[in-house]
Amino acid sequence: MKSVLRRVLIPIVAVVAGLLPGVVMVEQASALTKLSQAQAESLFRAVGITWSSSGGCTNRNISTCTSFAQINDTTVYGARTLKTASGCAINITGGTETGHASGTYSHWNGYKIDISKYTCVGNYIHTYFTRIANRGDGYPQWRSGSGNIYADEGSHWDITYYNCGGC
């Protein structure tokens, strides 16, 4: 409920504050809602998002698993937004499991997922998102209108969700 309320009130406050003189920007509080494996699976399943792992498991501490434990709700809703907006098949191959690069906006901290590189989703990203500078490791990136980042890592898309993408 708190998460839903936050999603409704933040944009309203931002619009109202934007109309007041001297106010430039309102930032969302950094409080995040972390989801369990079961909660995330249920939300993904509801819109037809699938997931797979080379290890056939969901244990967060095993790198060959695909885990959603401690994933941010904005990441889950961002993936759902991509699915519904694009109409493409989405298969998640990487979540919050160990083995990814560290950092504030990392897989482990719930901000990132990896998805299979299907033609449909690639075409959608290339058509509707803005090409930006390559990532530090050389991979090309696109930014959505809401500011989320989609990096083409060759075999999959590495997506960083700062927000739910207009959910």
Q: What positions do the PLM features span?
A:
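Secretory targeting and sorting signals
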Residues: M1-A29
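Active-site acidic/histidine clusters and adjacent loop/turn architecture
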Residues: L32-G87, N91
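Conserved beta-strand termini and adjacent loop/short-helix elements that scaffold enzyme active sites
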Residues: S54, T93-G95, Y162
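Acidic helix-start/capping segments at beta-turn-to-alpha-helix junctions
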Residues: G94-G103
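Catalytic cores and adjacent binding grooves of peptidoglycan-active enzymes
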Residues: T104-C167
